[in-house]
């Protein structure tokens, strides 16, 4: 049986949400992502598509891209753009698109069932 537990989410500070919120990373090609980040460096896309910090000679999957994403996220946390929830919780969400609503549940889950 799967083991799940609550966790302390890291999320944008309320006063920064409008600048940080971004569409999913996979709706942009690299060139489009660069333009979005250039227009709004606070966008989460700068972290999600950290290759936007490098020229085109750096592969999207290069280790330094992942290191840059880590650096950017840690910096956003350090300056208070992201906050950590004080108490662990489960998270429930609803997404609506084209009149169809999808509900979800977010929690920490053990990987033990996948290792067997």
Mark where each language-model region is.
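A cross-family signal for N-terminal binding/gating loops and helix N-caps
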Residues: 1-115
């Amino acid at each position: 049986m799967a083991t799940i537990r609550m966790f302390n989410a890291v999320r944008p500070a309320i006063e920064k949400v409008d600048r940080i919120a971004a569409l999913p990373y996979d709706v942009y090609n690299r060139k489009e992502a660069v333009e979005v980040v250039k227009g709004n460096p606070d966008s989460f896309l700068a972290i999600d598509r950290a290759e936007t910090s490098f020229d085109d000679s750096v592969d999207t999957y290069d280790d330094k891209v992942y290191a840059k994403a880590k650096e950017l996220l840690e910096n956003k946390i350090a300056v208070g753009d992201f906050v950590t929830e004080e108490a662990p919780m489960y998270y429930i969400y609803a997404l609506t698109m084209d009149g169809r609503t999808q509900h979800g549940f977010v929690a920490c889950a053990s990987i033990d069932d996948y290792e067997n």
